UniProtKB/Swiss-Prot annotation:
Its biological purpose: Component of the CTLH E3 ubiquitin-protein ligase complex that selectively accepts ubiquitin from UBE2H and mediates ubiquitination and subsequent proteasomal degradation of the transcription factor HBP1. Required for internalization of the GABA receptor GABRA1 from the cell membrane via endosomes and subsequent GABRA1 degradation. Acts as a mediator of cell spreading and cytoskeletal responses to the extracellular matrix component THBS1.
Lineage: Eukaryota, Metazoa, Chordata, Craniata, Vertebrata
Quaternary structure and partners: Homodimer; may form higher oligomers. Identified in the CTLH complex that contains GID4, RANBP9 and/or RANBP10, MKLN1, MAEA, RMND5A (or alternatively its paralog RMND5B), GID8, ARMC8, WDR26 and YPEL5. Within this complex, MAEA, RMND5A (or alternatively its paralog RMND5B), GID8, WDR26, and RANBP9 and/or RANBP10 form the catalytic core, while GID4, MKLN1, ARMC8 and YPEL5 have ancillary roles. Interacts with RANBP9. Part of a complex consisting of RANBP9, MKLN1 and GID8. Interacts with GABRA1. Interacts with the C-terminal tail of PTGER3.
Gene3D superfamilies membership: Galactose-binding domain-like (2.60.120.260), Kelch-type beta propeller (2.120.10.80)
Gene: MKLN1
Stretches assigned to the LisH domain: 172-204
PANTHER family attached to this UniProt entry: MUSKELIN (PTHR15526:SF5)
GO cellular component, one term: cytosol
InterPro entries documented for this protein: Beta-prop_ATRN-MKLN-like, CTLH_C, CTLH_complex_component, Gal_Oxase/kelch_b-propeller, Galactose-bd-like_sf, Kelch-typ_b-propeller, LisH, Muskelin_N
Protein name per the record: Muskelin
PTM annotation (N-acetylalanine): residues: A2
Protein location: Cytoplasm; Cytoplasm, Cytosol; Nucleus, Nucleoplasm; Cell projection, Ruffle
Kelch repeats: 284-330, 339-391, 408-458, 469-515, 526-578, 597-651
C-alpha cells in the first residue's frame, strides 16, 4: 500500500523487444526475421516453414526476462491459406524447459489478433526469457505455415520481474522436493521421507491428507478414514471437484394439479410462438399468447411451481386494456418492480395495413393485475417498427430494456419503397423505463467493421446482469443461417466479437439452422442452449434431435451436455415422449437461476402430415452434477471395496459377510453398472494374493501398494491446493 492509503498503480504493460533465436526451417526468402516488421500489404514479409511436417517452430529470445502477458499476430491484408488455423505457444527461462502458455487459432482474415498468455501460477506471476511458437495446422490443407508479424507485450521492469524470478526459482525447487517426498512415501522409504521433510520444512500436502494417508495406508484404520472423508465432504472440500464435472440433464414432465370441474380449461392449451417469463423470487412462470394452429391467442397464465398449478389471469387481455391476440412477440420481466413488458407480433400479410402495422408496447403490473399501454406506435416514439422473431432483455438495475433484431413487417404492394420486396431487419434499441424514451444504439449493418452488428431473426440474446453485457448468437437473415457470436457492453457501447462464425469447429458448437432457445446464469457464468427442430422443412426430417449445450463465459468454450440421437427412431417400442420433450420449434424455455431449473412449454413438432398440430406439454429440466452425497457414498464404496479385497486374502468367510452387508449398502442397486460391478466383486474370494500386482510398486509389499493406489484415487476429489504434486518422479526420466 502506498503512502496515504492509495493503492499502488498496476505495473505498465509494454511492448517487449525480442530477437529470433532458433527455428525449425524456412523456405526461400521467407526468413524468420520477417516477423519483426509489420507489413500487411507485402506478401513476402513473413516467415514460412519449409514443410508442414512437425515439429515446426520459432523460438524468440527476449532482451531480458519479462512477464509475457500477451502475444499479437499481424496478418496479410487478404485471407491466406498459410495462416495458422491452430498453434501453441510455450515459454520458459530456458529453451529446454518450457510451459504451455496458449493453445488457440487465428481467424483467416486481415485483422490483427491479440491473445492473453498464461503468466501466473497460483496467482503469482512468473517470468520467461524464451517464447516458442509451434504451428499445428494451416487454413489451407497441406500448405506450409506462415507467420507475418509477432508482437509480445508484458512487464519487463526489473523491480517487478526479479522478485517473480526469485519466486519462480524457489517454486520449482519446492515442487522438485515435493516430487521426491511423494516418491519416497509411495515406496515406503520412511527414513528418507522424514529426513528430507525435516531438513526442508516443505509440506507434501495439506495436514488433513497426511492424516488420511496415516489412517488408510499406514494403519489400515478404514473407519477413521471414512470419518475423515465425511468431514471433508461436509466442509465443502469436494466442491471444486464437483464444479469441474460434466452436467447430466434430467427432464421431468410436469403434470399440473387440476381443479375439479374445470376440464381442460385449467391450463394453457396447445400453442407455438407464445412467450414466457419467470419471476424467480416467487417461482412463478407467466405465459402469454401464441398461435394454436388456426388463430392467435390472447390468454394470460401464471404457473406456480410451489403449488404445481396453472392460474388463468385473463382469457382475453385485450378486454382488460391489454395487448390483442398475438404470436411471435417478445416479453421480459422486471423482477425488482414486478412488471412484465411485451413488444412486437406477427401479422399475416392479408391483414396488414397502416393501422395494424403500428407497433404497440404494453406493461403489466403483477401486484395490481393491470395492463398499461406505453405506446401505440414505438416507431413514432423513436423506437423499433413492428417486428416479430426479435429479442428483448431487461436490465433491472438500470431500469432499461434492450431489443435487437426481428423482421420488420411492411405492407405489400408498396410502390414507393424499392426495397419493399427485400426483408428488412430491426437494429439494436434501448428503452429507458423511467423516462419512457427509446434510443437507437446500432442500425442493421452488413459491414464487417469492429462495432457493426448484423440484424437477424430467430437469434438468441441474453443479458448478463453482473458483467453488464448482452450476448447475441445464431439466427437467420433471409436464407442465410448466421453462426457468429458477439457481446455488447451496455455501459461502454462496445461490441466484442467472440466468434465470427468462420472457424470450422463443427461438432464443437451448436449447429446453425436449428431453433435455439438460450438462458443465462450470471452466478455460474454460463449460457445454456437447447437446440431443437429446424423451421426449414427441407432440413427437418433427416436430423431430428434435441441437443443441449453450455457455453462457459470465462473459459470461452462450448460443451455439449447431451444429444438424444434420435433415440425414439432407433427404439420404436420406447417412447421418447416419456423421457424428454420431442424436438420442436416455436416453443419457449425459461430459466430460474436461483433454483437452477429450466421450464419448457409447447411449440410446433413440425409434423408435415399435420401442419396445424401444436403441443401443450410442460417440462422441467435440471442440469445435475454429482452431489456431495453421491461422492461420499462413492468414496465409502471405494474404501469398503478395498477393505473387502484385503479381508478376502486372509478370511474369505468374514469377507463374504462384509460384502453382503457393509459393502452392499454403499451401492446404488438401481444403477445397472454399479450393480454389475458389485456382483463381480465376489470373484475376489477365489483369487490368490499373487493375482494382484500394482504397477511400479515392486519394492513394497502388496497391501501397502494397493492402499497407496486407493489413497491416490481419493486425493483426486480434493482441491489442487491441498494435494501432492500430480506428476511422478520416475516420469522425468527420459530414455
Amino acid at each position: 500500500m502506498a503512502a496515504g492509503g492509495a493503492v499502488a498503480a498496476a505495473p505498465e504493460c509494454r511492448l517487449l523487444p525480442y530477437a529470433l533465436h532458433k527455428w525449425s526451417s524456412f523456405s526461400s526468402t521467407y526468413l524468420p526475421e520477417n516477423i519483426l516488421v509489420d507489413k500487411p500489404n507485402d506478401q513476402s514479409s513473413r516467415w514460412s516453414s519449409e514443410s508442414n511436417y512437425p515439429p515446426q517452430y520459432l523460438i524468440l529470445k527476449l532482451e531480458r526476462p519479462a512477464i509475457v502477458q500477451n502475444i499479437t499476430f499481424g496478418k496479410y491484408e487478404k485471407t491466406h491459406v498459410c495462416n495458422l488455423k491452430k498453434f501453441k505457444v510455450f515459454g520458459g527461462m530456458n529453451e529446454e524447459n518450457m510451459t504451455e502458455l496458449l493453445s488457440s487459432g487465428l481467424k483467416n482474415d486481415y485483422n490483427k489478433e491479440t491473445f492473453t498468455l498464461k503468466h501466473k501460477i497460483d496467482e503469482q506471476m512468473f517470468p520467461c526469457r524464451f517464447i516458442k511458437i509451434v504451428p499445428l495446422l494451416s487454413w489451407g490443407p497441406s500448405f506450409n505455415f506462415s507467420i507475418w508479424y509477432v508482437e509480445l507485450s508484458g512487464i519487463d521492469d526489473p523491480d517487478i520481474v526479479q522478485p517473480c524470478l526469485n519466486w519462480y526459482s524457489k517454486y520449482r525447487e519446492q515442487e522438485a522436493i515435493r516430487l521426491c517426498l511423494k516418491h519416497f512415501r509411495q515406496h515406503n522409504y520412511t527414513e528418507a521421507f522424514e529426513s528430507l521433510q525435516k531438513k526442508t520444512k516443505i509440506a507434501l500436502e495439506h495436514p488433513m491428507l497426511t492424516d488420511i494417508h496415516d489412517k488408510l495406508v499406514l494403519k489400515g484404520d478404514f473407519d477413521a478414514c471414512e470419518e475423515l472423508i465425511e468431514k471433508a465432504v461436509n466442509d465443502g472440500l469436494f466442491n471444486q471437484y464437483i464444479s469441474q464435472q460434466e452436467y447430466k440433464p434430467r427432464w421431468s414432465q410436469i403434470i399440473p394439479k387440476s381443479t375439479k370441474g374445470d376440464g381442460e380449461d385449467n391450463r394453457p392449451g396447445m400453442r407455438g410462438g407464445h412467450q414466457m417469463v419467470i419471476d424467480v423470487q416467487t417461482e412463478t412462470v407467466y405465459l402469454f399468447g401464441g398461435w394454436d394452429g388456426t388463430q392467435d391467442l390472447a390468454d394470460f397464465w401464471a404457473y406456480s411451481v410451489k403449488e404445481n398449478q396453472w392460474t388463468c389471469i385473463s382469457r382475453d387481455t385485450e378486454k382488460e386494456n391489454g395487448p390483442s391476440a398475438r404470436s411471435c412477440h417478445k416479453m421480459c420481466i422486471d423482477i425488482q418492480r414486478r412488471q412484465i413488458y411485451t413488444l412486437g407480433r406477427y401479422l399475416d400479410s392479408s391483414v396488414r395495413n397502416s393501422k395494424s402495422l403500428k407497433s404497440d408496447f404494453y406493461r403489466y403490473d403483477i401486484d395490481t393485475n393491470t395492463w398499461m399501454l406505453l405506446s401505440e406506435d414505438t416507431a413514432a416514439d423513436g423506437g423499433p417498427k413492428l417486428v416479430f422473431d426479435h429479442q428483448m432483455c431487461m436490465d433491472s438495475e438500470k431500469h432499461m430494456i434492450y431489443t435487437f433484431g426481428g423482421r420488420i413487417l411492411t405492407c405489400n404492394g408498396s410502390v414507393d419503397d424499392s426495397r419493399a420486396s427485400e426483408p428488412q431487419f430491426s437494429g439494436l434499441f434501448a428503452f429507458n423505463c423511467q423516462c419512457q424514451t427509446w434510443k437507437l444504439l446500432r442500425e442493421d449493418s452488413c459491414n464487417a467493421g469492429p462495432e457493426d452488428i448484423q440484424s437477424r431473426i430467430g437469434h438468441c440474446m441474453l443479458f448478463h446482469s453482473k458483467n453488464r453485457c448482452l450476448y447475441v448468437f445464431g439466427g437467420q437473415r433471409s436464407k442465410t443461417y448466421l453462426n457468429d457470436f458477439f457481446s455488447y457492453d451496455v455501459d461502454s457501447d462496445h461490441v466484442d466479437i467472440i466468434s465470427d462464425g468462420t472457424k470450422k469447429d463443427s461438432g464443437m458448437v451448436p449447429m446453425t439452422g436449428f431453433t435455439q432457445r438460450a438462458t443465462i446464469d450470471p452466478e455460474l457464468n454460463e449460457i445454456h442452449v437447447l437446440s431443437g427442430l429446424s423451421k426449414d422443412k427441407e432440413k427437418r426430417e433427416e436430423n431430428v434431435r434435441n441437443s443441449f449445450w453450455i457455453y462457459d463465459i470465462v473459459r470461452n468454450s462450448w460443451s455439449c451436455v447431451y444429444k438424444n440421437d434420435q433415440a425414439a427412431k432407433d427404439n420404436p417400442t420406447k417412447s421418447l415422449q416419456e423421457e424428454e420433450p420431442c424436438p420442436r420449434f416455436a416453443h419457449q424455455l425459461v430459466y430460474d437461476e436461483l433454483h437452477k431449473v429450466h421450464y419448457l412449454f409447447g411449440g410446433n413438432p413440425g409434423k408435415s402430415c399435420s401442419p396445424k398440430m401444436r403441443l401443450d406439454d410442460f417440462w422441467s429440466l435440471k442440469l445435475c452434477r454429482p452431489s456431495k452425497d453421491y461422492l461420499l457414498r462413492h468414496c465409502k464404496y471405494l474404501i469398503r471395496k478395498h477393505r473387502f479385497e484385503e479381508k478376502a486374502q486372509v478370511d474369505p468367510l468374514s469377507a463374504l459377510k462384509y460384502l453382503q452387508n457393509d459393502l452392499y449398502i454403499t451401492v446404488d442397486h438401481s444403477d445397472p453398472e454399479e450393480t454389475k460391478e458389485f456382483q463381480l466383486l465376489a470373484s475376489a474370494l477365489f483369487k490368490s494374493g499373487s493375482d494382484f500386482t500394482a504397477l511400479g510398486f515392486s519394492d513394497v509389499d502388496h497391501t501397502y501398494a494397493q492402499r497407496t493406489q486407493l489413497f491416490d484415487t481419493l486425493v483426486n476429489f480434493f482441491p489442487d491446493s491441498m494435494t501432492p504434486p500430480k506428476g511422478n518422479l520416475v516420469d522425468l526420466i527420459t530414455l
